[in-house]
Amino acid sequence: MNRYQKLCKKLIPFKKGCFIPFVVLGDPSIDMSLKIINALIENGADGLELGIPFSDPIADGEIIQKANLRAFNSKINLHKCFDILSEIREKHQTIPIGLLLYSNLIFKFGINKFYLKCYKIGIDSILIADLPIEESYVFRKYAVINNILPVFICPPDAKKNVIKNIAIHSQGYIYLLSRSGVTGINQEIMIPPLSLINKLKKLTKTPLIQGFGVSYPYQIQKIILSGISGVICGSIIAKLIENYFQDDDKLIKEIIFLSKSFKKATIIIE
């Protein structure tokens, strides 16, 4: 049983969903990035989705693009990202850790070499933002060889054959999009079509986790009530960093408040 399965199995009897924050490694600095991640885990986060900074993050809106720029300004690189990841895994042994990145970073490092490095660090899953499932065979092959769980994005308008492929090959969780487009902060409650949720649940036991625009506790409560296992929240965290990165104490206080309130919202109230 992988860490995602263990997490969901632990939460279901208590009628809780999982809260997975997304943070760009190195934002706003290497040291502060670690402090933010630790504060999230210690105050409610059930798992982590961590971004490797990239110069052209095409799936991301302005807020996450700025987070990538701040990370590059902190002199982050892939090897420093691996060091941060090793430190997080050493401190937090049981929490699921996923990476979100772009395919060119893996190509440049070497596909097998990258997955092997992630396995040695203790990474659970990898989601490649610009990789359609139809073109994923080589990446899936090396993920499986190196005991890394591949994760794929399922858009709300996915066709039948795409849904089936995602259900077969997405192993850590299935990343359900709230909407088409790029990442960002939203005030609306956007839940993927119930027909899509039910179709995926018939095809697989892999947890369904929703992301893109999940920004407030009231949204999270509705999402969990719809039968989705959890949420990924990134832009709202990156916006806090953007607003308070020059005041470390204030930033950590805001992160702690967010983590506690978002986790509380995953508890189903009937």
Curated annotation (Swiss-Prot):
Any one cellular-component term (Gene Ontology): cytosol
Cross-referenced CDD domains: Tryptophan_synthase_alpha
GO MF entry, a single one: tryptophan synthase activity
InterPro entries found in the cross-reference section: Aldolase_TIM, RibuloseP-bd_barrel, Trp_synthase_alpha_AS, Trp_synthase_suA
Catalytic activity, reaction form: (1S,2R)-1-C-(indol-3-yl)glycerol 3-phosphate + L-serine = D-glyceraldehyde 3-phosphate + L-tryptophan + H2O
Organism domain of life: Bacteria
Name of a matching Pfam family: Trp_syntA
Keywords: Amino-acid biosynthesis, Aromatic amino acid biosynthesis, Lyase, Tryptophan biosynthesis
Active site: 49 (proton acceptor), 60 (proton acceptor)
Family per record: Belongs to the TrpA family.
Subunit structure: Tetramer of two alpha and two beta chains.
Record-given protein name: Tryptophan synthase alpha chain
Lineage: Bacteria, Pseudomonadati, Pseudomonadota, Gammaproteobacteria, Enterobacterales
